[in-house]
Amino acid sequence: MVDYNNFANKFAKSRKNMKWEEIDYFLEKIDKNNDLKILDIWCGSWRLLEQFSQNFNIDKIDYFWLDLSSEMLVVAKKNFPNKNFLNLNMLNVDKIKNKFNNIFFIASYHHLDNIEDREETLKKAYNLLEKWWRIFMTNWALNSEINNEKYNKALIKNSENKFKSTDYNIVFWENDRYYHCFDLSELEYLATKNNFRIIENRLFDSKRNFITILEK
């Protein structure tokens, strides 16, 4: 599992003022008139929370953010001191007893390095989600036309699984980071196995990330 403590401050600074089109797309699909209960799983830095604050009355949102990196949470707390933060591995998300009406995996789910953990994490997220509500997910499309040339050398040889998904080891700030590049069929399999209805599962318009929207 990726340890962001080694470069939390650098990562946060690199994401400062970065606006994700995918997040804006997700936020457009959320009803501002509802009492929002948000679970942010390993978003990193505070980009999702920041974009929420630009589009919603953040003081009225019950926002719960968990991250494996304690240093990343320290940075986030300085910017949003009144929100709920928990240092927790996403594999243990079932330790949270709250229920949520929107759960986000923004560039986080692709760090899980085996299908058993992917299945189990999604199952646990399903149990935390209120009926008829949604999970929003982005995963890095490392094999897309726009990404492939830059990251092809980081592809781990012979890592292709039965879905034709592949694994990458990418170095940032002298630290290795593992990424799973999903084939959309694997995401579809994981969703249906865990009883989700698939709203969207596709390469986003910018061609950099896959987006997946699932409904309980």
Predicted regions located by residue number:
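A short glycine-rich, Lys/Arg-flanked "PGG" loop and its adjoining helix->strand segment in the class I
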Residues: 119-131
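Core SAM-dependent methyltransferase catalytic element
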Residues: 202-216
